[in-house]
């Protein structure tokens, strides 16, 4: 089986594929100081809890936007799986031209999302990823990565409110607000985040559409995608597994033929 690993600034998402089918996924916190053996213990425990074995893994592909973590993860793969993983980065075949001033600056996760979106929709698409940062990426109808937008993520904004104010509490769980007019502090912050980010998303998508001048499919992914999409009429689809699917596609384009 293929183990796909998406290492983000806040969380690391793992997906186990049997051919093209995602059979299980896990989400763990990204920790810069985690050792090789700590990764081994954690991932073996996750596998054991769901009836999988380290020996089941025949290949690994990794997308990582946290360079200090990558070396430990590579060594973990060699020690516990006896596998040299494929790392998404320069020199990897994505099948997608990247039109960016410096293509090396584009986060691996953004390219992986773009590859998955074009492979699935085959049309001009905007991918909105609600991660540590909220990103908007435009893929042309020819399957070209054309650039995008980076804005502060939802949790970054919440942490800023908590650390930069004296009386506002930390809020980590969000729900669809019953009303924009809230009656207590927590509800007020919840409404501000949900409706504020829905407005941000609609505003950026509208500006991108006006500038691009073509009809676009909009797909959202990331931890809070479904919640924000419920308040944003411009998002067409939500795919929680878009990044993992993109990693599988890129693996197929780079695996060695027997």
Swiss-Prot record:
Keyword Lipoprotein: no
Cofactor(s) the protein requires to work: NH4(+); K(+)
GO molecular function: ATP binding; metal ion binding; pantothenate kinase activity
GO CC list: cytoplasm
Free-text cofactor note: A monovalent cation. Ammonium or potassium.
GO biological process per UniProt: coenzyme A biosynthetic process
EC number assigned by the record: 2.7.1.33
Binding site for K(+): 129
Keyword annotations from UniProtKB, A to Z: ATP-binding, Coenzyme A biosynthesis, Cytoplasm, Kinase, Metal-binding, Nucleotide-binding, Potassium, Transferase
Binding positions for ATP per the UniProt entry: 6-13, 132
Active site: 109
Catalytic activity: (R)-pantothenate + ATP = (R)-4'-phosphopantothenate + ADP + H(+)
Enzyme class: transferase
CDD domains: ASKHA_NBD_PanK-III (cd24015)
Cellular compartment(s): Cytoplasm
Annotated positions binding substrate: 100, 107-110, 185
Pathway: Cofactor biosynthesis; coenzyme A biosynthesis; CoA from (R)-pantothenate: step 1/5
Subunit structure of this chain's protein: Homodimer.
Family: Belongs to the type III pantothenate kinase family.
Protein name according to UniProt: Type III pantothenate kinase
Gene: coaX
């Amino acid at each position: 089986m293929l183990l796909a690993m998406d290492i983000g600034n806040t969380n690391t998402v793992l997906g186990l594929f049997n051919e093209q089918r995602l059979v299980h996924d896990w989400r763990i916190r990204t920790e810069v100081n985690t050792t090789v053996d700590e990764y081994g213990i954690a991932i073996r425990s996750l596998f054991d809890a769901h009836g999988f074995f380290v020996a089941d893994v025949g290949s690994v592909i990794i997308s990582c936007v946290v360079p200090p973590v990558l070396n430990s993860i590579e060594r973990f793969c060699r020690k516990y799986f006896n596998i040299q993983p494929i790392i998404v980065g320069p020199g990897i075949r994505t099948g997608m031209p990247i039109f960016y001033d410096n293509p090396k600056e584009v986060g691996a996760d953004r390219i992986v999302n773009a590859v998955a979106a074009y492979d699935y929709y085959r049309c001009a698409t905007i991918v909105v990823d609600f991660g540590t940062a909220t990103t908007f990426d435009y893929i042309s109808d020819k399957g070209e990565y054309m650039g995008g937008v980076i804005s502060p993520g939802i949790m970054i904004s919440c942490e800023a409110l908590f650390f930069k104010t004296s009386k506002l509490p930390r809020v980590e769980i969000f729900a669809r607000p019953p009303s924009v007019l809230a009656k207590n502090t927590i509800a007020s912050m919840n409404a501000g985040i949900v409706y504020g980010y829905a407005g941000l998303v609609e505003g950026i998508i509208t500006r991108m559409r006006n500038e691009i001048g073509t009809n676009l499919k909009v797909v959202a992914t990331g931890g809070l995608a479904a919640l924000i999409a419920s308040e944003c009429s411009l998002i067409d689809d939500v795919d929680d597994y878009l990044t993992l699917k993109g990693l599988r596609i890129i693996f197929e384009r780079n695996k060695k033929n027997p």
